[in-house]
Design a protein with these regions (language model features):
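N-terminal beta-alpha lobe that positions the nucleotide/phosphoryl donor
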Residues: 1-175, 179-204
Length: 207
């Protein structure tokens, strides 16, 4: 017979919806930024923002590539951006659902490459630092990251493995994390595919 090489449709669905991905990570002790589930009203977002403090960011649950995201620094900006973000989400991804997160100012963007087999084994191949970006699009990738120490490297790698095992992941994938100025790091999303940036990891790992 024919076997598809890569993650199952269920694994891709779980990580493709960012609100579901956040919930899955919380259940598996992977740190995430303070955030919400799917929000429908301006008032829900404002209540969350006033609880955690501005700035916050609105994100499309089905989003990617820097689309369907709006940073809000006040209640007024939530009113201005909520409908725009939902409209962008529907136009770009066919799904108007959005959620809110605490926005980290100028974080480092660290991603960890993982590989899983069909027997439940998962390994990570270290991290790439893709903090140099323009309009949320990566311009330069570096491995290993110059911004993290060995302890953080081990913790991020272990979290990426936990994330992959939580969804019975098969094949190559990437867990993306944000690193703040205090050295705290948070899961952002998982790309359920091999990325073009894998060549950077290949040069380091030969895999």
């Amino acid at each position: 017979g024919i076997k598809f090489i890569g993650p199952t449709a269920e694994a891709m669905r779980k990580m493709g919806d960012k609100a579901t991905a956040r919930k899955t990570m919380i259940e598996n002790d992977v740190p995430v930024t303070p955030g919400t589930g799917i929000v429908k009203t301006v008032e829900e977002v404002q209540d969350f923002a006033n609880e955690v403090g501005y700035p916050i960011i609105l994100k499309a649950t089905a989003g990617g590539g820097g689309k369907g995201m709006r940073i809000c620094r006040s209640d007024e900006e939530v009113e201005l951006n909520m409908e725009l973000c939902q409209s962008e989400a529907k136009n770009f991804f066919g799904n108007p659902d959005v959620y809110a997160e605490k926005y980290l100012e100028n974080p480092r963007h660290i991603e960890v490459q993982i590989l899983g087999d069909s027997f439940g084994n998962v390994v990570h191949l270290g991290e790439r630092d893709c903090s140099i970006q323009r309009r949320h699009q990566k311009l330069l990738e570096e491995a290993p990251s110059p911004a993290i120490n060995e302890e953080t490297r081990k913790q991020m790698g272990a979290a990426a493995v936990r994330a992959a095992k939580a969804i019975n992941y098969e094949g190559a994938g990437t867990c993306e994390f944000l690193l703040d100025h205090d050295g705290k790091w948070y899961f952002m999303e998982m790309n359920t595919r091999i990325q073009v940036e894998h060549c950077v990891t290949h040069l380091k790992s030969f895999l």
